[in-house]
Amino acid sequence: MSRKSYPNVNAANQYARDVVRGKIVACQFVIQACQRHLDDLMAEKSKSFRYRFDKDLAERVAKFIQLLPHTKGEWAFKRMPITLEPWQLFVICCAFGWVNKGSRLRRFREVYTEIPRKNGKSAISAGVALYCFACDNEFGAEVYSGATTEKQAWEVFRPARLMCKRTPMLTEAFGIEVNASNMNRPEDGARFEPLIGNPGDGSSPHCAVVDEYHEHATDALYTTMLTGMGARRQPLMWAITTAGYNIEGPCYDKRREVIEMLNGSVPNDELFGIIYTVDEGDDWTDPQVLEKANPNIGVSVYREFLLSQQQRAKNNARLANVFKTKHLNIWVSARSAYFNLVSWQSCEDKSLTLEQFEGQPCILAFDLARKLDMNSMARLYTREIDGKTHYYSVAPRFWVPYDTVYSVEKNEDRRTAERFQKWVEMGVLTVTDGAEVDYRYILEEAKAANKISPVSESPIDPFGATGLSHDLADEDLNPVTIVQNFANMSDPMKELEAAIESGRFHHDGNPIMTWCIGNVVGKNMPGNDDLVKPVKEQAENKIDGAVALIMTIGRAMLKEPDDFLSSLDPDDDLLIL
């Protein structure tokens, strides 16, 4: 008996290995997606890991899609079947190959792919939709190609319809009727059709394809499709898009969710995501970055075309943003994060514990925000190594009121609540009773910290801090009220960045602190680019933990020869209680 072969799965896994090893040029998000897959392949050997990679399923889907014909351009004229490139095989095999060990049902309910134009989005989406429509063992499958306009909804449905019309064996084998504006299977009532705008609440999709998600002003279609999948055994939400301009829209929000999943700050075992773009710091005018953002370069998008578009963009500022967005997948209206999250993650040391610093003085800092919101406590230790100051962030604490986590009514707060719920389950976020955070919880944590390590100072955000400040003073925890202005925050913010980049900063990998650090945007003082303070791009992008950490760095710097506050007016900028 001949041994089974898995050429497509093998190519997908080899792609992941080549990306991680640096043999294929890729951005950090692609590297993280590949590393996640490889890590999970190792983890599946453990009984505690809930999922396994089913090579047969993955190979089956990849083979099915490659039986379908091209519907556009030269390859369609030559009647050539689709050939999936290694990156496409990786996405397909991950999306369909990972299953629950017990049920064998699909692991990933949501798949988000962000990729520049002309990289074969519509063809791969049409293939996925047809597979779910005809071959996914779902009785009466409903498959929708959803978009905000009729033209966009047909971008996936039209090639899928043409694939069926040009493949009689497919329609005969699965009993597919191809109509003018929909396809159906009379045998079980399955149907596949385009969907425009808000679909209402009657749909029960098995698969929903959302093409060019960045064009959606609201998440109405996406959410309705997702919530309508409850009656399906293994539904699939397939979103594929280029970058856009609306960072207030649902696509950018989903992008942030994917990034948080990839960097581990908010785990989500049912979400697969991959983002093809350039890295922070890359020069968009450098021809070398084209391959990083465009995995299909030389196949469906030609290098010469991209080089000409790049040159036009360099010569015409009006075209620069279009090129960055559509060909490099850069959200041009999004402000860059201040701290390099890759460097931050390289500073992670999960072996750090409070016991290692027992008896050593520490600085506690508190960012209290609003009582309805997240409140933070950062804990910092310092050590001198080879004449240089090393900083250690260990066991930060975070609190949020119960109602903020579990009694959410407003749609815009839902994503934040889901994020908080994940952290509560992980044991890194403390929920306090009621609608407001009870500061007595925070005081008790500060008192407990002082028993482990003597607290030298407690810098605190002045917003609503009067009561807690007095309580801290009563416990001899030396509260210091810090006004979060340019003068007080600039130098410690720069020192934290320098310490991260030089390896002088160490942290225990707390996911909430990582999330807060990743949300920090630097705002320069008008007329003075040398002064900077931390701000957030959007209200839901909390930076409380990062602000508290920056305050601890500022107080630690006071002990160094260069006193960063020596020139300040203490009455205006620093109030010591």
Swiss-Prot record:
State whether keyword 4Fe-4S applies: no
Instruction: Please provide the record's keywords in A-Z order.
Output: Viral genome packaging, Viral release from host cell
What the entry lists under InterPro entries is as follows: P-loop_NTPase (IPR027417), TerL_ATPase (IPR046461), TerL_nuclease (IPR046462), Terminase_largesu-like (IPR005021)
**Superkingdom, according to UniProt?**
Viruses
- What molecular functions are annotated in GO for this chain? endonuclease activity
Pfam families assigned to the protein according to its UniProt record, in alphabetical order = TerL_ATPase, TerL_nuclease
Keyword Magnesium in annotation: no
Q: Record's family?
A: Belongs to the phage terminase family.
Supply the name of the protein.
Putative terminase large subunit
Organism of this sequence: Shigella phage SfV
